[in-house]
């Protein structure tokens, strides 16, 4: 069970906490509130930091959907998205769902798997609002879904529950930042203090390789070691990150 402080003025907060197994604690580090019909996580000892929510409808993700480069983006190349090929993807470390949304907006069917209950609650709330949106709601309902569980233990269960045959498993485990690196974005500071680094991330590769029929893609900082010490088949490098691609079979239409 995860302790959380929440504003009891909102009955939907109580139902959300009951659904996700969250326990009221007046001394908790984090607070869940509804602001303008959006479930938001606040770090209580840093009130100047912006709260965290999942928004697939507006803001940065909407801008990227419209102007982010389409299929020319590195993430699209990494998962094998091309003319006539629209892979089904399991995002095994969903986080705030941004990479999953990019892939869904490009036409992929994406199942998000998230093990942290608070993050899963934020994702579900983001999906709720996206499903109701007049512009993107139709294809969001068809392409994006959520499973709450650990990808180390439950990856195959997630795919089975959604009746999904998986072409690609996508992983972006939280990696410790270098001490000398620039200050982490304020929003990510809140997120990282909640979930911490994925110290068991090496355990993700084997179940991902077992589930994916075509490839596994691992997003890593440019300075990070290969996941579980396994060299990828190919690497797609960006300015600060890289996509390690473990190929099992060709991507065909």
From Swiss-Prot:
Recorded catalytic reaction(s): these are: guanosine(1516) in 16S rRNA + S-adenosyl-L-methionine = N(2)-methylguanosine(1516) in 16S rRNA + S-adenosyl-L-homocysteine + H(+)
> What EC number(s) does its UniProt record assign?
2.1.1.242
Give a Pfam family name: SAM_MT
Q: What top-level class of enzyme does the UniProt entry assign?
A: transferase
Q: Which UniProt keywords apply?
A: Cytoplasm, Methyltransferase, rRNA processing, S-adenosyl-L-methionine, Transferase
Record's keyword annotation contains Lipid biosynthesis: no
Q: Which GO terms describe its cellular component?
A: cytoplasm
Q: Which GO terms describe its molecular function?
A: rRNA (guanine-N2-)-methyltransferase activity
Q: What is its main location?
A: cytoplasm
Q: Which SUPFAM superfamilies match?
A: S-adenosyl-L-methionine-dependent methyltransferases
Domain of life where this protein originates: Bacteria
Which InterPro entries does this one have? 16SrRNA_methylTrfase_J (IPR007536), SAM-dependent_MTases_sf (IPR029063)
Instruction: Give the UniProt subcellular location, in the record's own words.
Output: Cytoplasm
Which cysteines share a disulfide bond?
none
Residues reported in the UniProt entry to bind S-adenosyl-L-methionine:
98-99, 114-115, 150-151, 172
TM ranges are none
Task: Write out the coiled-coil annotation as residue ranges.
Answer: none
Role of this protein: Specifically methylates the guanosine in position 1516 of 16S rRNA.
Q: Enumerate the PANTHER family for this protein.
A: RIBOSOMAL RNA SMALL SUBUNIT METHYLTRANSFERASE J (PTHR36112:SF1)
State the family named in the UniProt similarity comment for this chain: Belongs to the methyltransferase superfamily. RsmJ family.
Q: Under what name is this protein listed?
A: Ribosomal RNA small subunit methyltransferase J
